């Protein structure tokens, strides 16, 4: 397991899982990827937070944020989701037909209504969730090795010498799959 030097900030450190409506693979689309990147930067500029780790998969996002003291992550996710949805439609994106209750609330079929959050409580908790983020594309069968997935902070952590490039690489015959059993109740997947 990598050796993390810093894991929390003043307002808390949180792991999030954000899922698209009905698990639509919206983020297979490069336009959606770019819109999400743009919207996150916009929201960060007005409502600062630090992204410690993130992975973008076709139908969901996992990330770890450091929050400012006494601040609100729900506001940030609401803004990210709503701004993304507006820009997604403005750029020709579509949504999925939604239930009557969603229609009554003027909700679109882009995001699941809520998100999953977990307060990181220790260095070990941080490390396990960060490992989960970086291993997630392998878990879902998109790649054999974390370094093969470009939509992840794994590469930044390798560059900073926190992870070796061949970390949990399934190309390595001696590599054991990680066990995330002890955090399964905190990942929301």
What are these regions (language model features)?
Residues 1-189:
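Short catalytic/metal-binding and nucleic-acid-binding patches
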């Amino acid at each position: 397991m990598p050796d993390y030097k810093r894991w929390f900030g003043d307002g808390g450190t949180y792991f999030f899982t954000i899922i698209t409506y009905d698990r639509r693979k919206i983020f297979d689309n490069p336009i959606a990827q770019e819109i999400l990147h743009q919207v996150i930067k916009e929201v960060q500029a007005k409502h600062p937070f630090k992204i410690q780790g993130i992975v973008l998969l076709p139908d969901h996002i996992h990330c770890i944020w450091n929050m400012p003291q006494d601040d609100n992550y729900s506001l940030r996710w609401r803004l990210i989701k709503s701004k993304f949805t507006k820009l997604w439609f403005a750029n020709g994106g579509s949504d999925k037909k939604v239930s009557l209750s969603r229609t009554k609330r003027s909700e679109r079929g882009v995001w699941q209504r809520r998100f999953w959050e977990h307060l990181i409580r220790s260095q070990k908790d941080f490390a396990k969730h960060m490992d989960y983020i970086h291993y997630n594309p392998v878990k879902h069968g998109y790649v054999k090795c974390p370094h093969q997935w470009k939509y992840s902070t794994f590469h930044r952590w390798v560059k900073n010498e926190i992870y070796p490039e061949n970390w949990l690489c399934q190309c390595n015959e001696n590599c054991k799959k990680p066990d995330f059993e002890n955090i399964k109740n905190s990942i929301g997947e």
